[in-house]
């Protein structure tokens, strides 16, 4: 997929502590890479057939509201359970990161870093592009002002000790450090 294996190791360590059965208490996120249901269905629909998951990809449809659906409940459970299979989850995480990498590079006109990719995982692709463009223009801008919903849900990221709001550069640096530490803790080098 062209995505650095060390990045994927770091992401899995940060997201789940390398636990294939990890589940978020605040969302539908599950597995090594903590895919939420809609993100998982999207990446499986787009790339599943390339990796022997044609049966899954062809069972994922899109409703009039734009949400991805699987009409058969047992098939839906089987597709979502794949988030807990380390090989499948890693392949789909790599494909998802590769898609994000291409889009970020096209949008910013530079090579995407591992931290850029992690921002896309955290904020979604549109949010990451918005974050990165704003950070390049004004690194001292307060992150919570730009992403109020994300800040409410992730106060430890957007605010420091005593509720002090963090700048875009500070948030980015925290993610960079977190990703580097996660990768190093599982033996990855050179992020």
Please state what every model-predicted region is.
Residues 3-19, 93-95, 117-125:
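Short, functionally critical alpha-helical segments immediately adjacent to catalytic or ligand/cofactor-binding
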Residues 19-21, 42-43:
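Short active-site-adjacent helix-start/loop capping segments
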Residues 37, 41-118, 122-130, 172, ...:
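Alpha-helical segment that forms one wall of the substrate-binding/catalytic cleft
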Residues 113-166:
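Catalytic and substrate-binding regions of cell-wall glycan-acting enzymes that process beta-1,4-linked
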Residues 2-4, 26, 111-112:
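Extracellular/periplasmic catalytic domains that process cell-envelope and extracellular macromolecules
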């Amino acid at each position: 997929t062209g995505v650095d294996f060390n990045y994927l190791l770091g992401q899995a360590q940060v997201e789940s502590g390398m636990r294939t059965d990890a589940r978020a208490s605040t969302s539908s996120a599950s597995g090594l890479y903590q895919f939420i249901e809609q993100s998982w269905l999207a990446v499986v629909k787009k790339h599943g057939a390339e990796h022997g998951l044609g049966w899954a990809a062809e069972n994922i449809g899109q409703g009039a509201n734009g949400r991805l659906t699987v009409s058969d409940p047992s098939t839906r459970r089987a597709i979502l359970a794949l988030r807990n299979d380390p090989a499948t989850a890693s392949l789909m995480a790599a494909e998802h990161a590769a898609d994000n990498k291409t889009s970020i590079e096209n949008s910013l006109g530079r090579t995407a870093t591992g931290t850029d990719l992690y921002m896309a995982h955290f904020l979604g692709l549109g949010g990451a592009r918005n974050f990165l463009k704003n950070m390049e223009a004004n690194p001292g801008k307060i992150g919570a002002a730009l992403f109020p919903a994300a800040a409410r849900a992730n106060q430890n990221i957007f605010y420091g000790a005593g509720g002090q709001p963090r700048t875009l550069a500070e948030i980015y640096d925290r993610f960079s450090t977190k990703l580097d530490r996660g990768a190093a803790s599982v033996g990855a080098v050179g992020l």
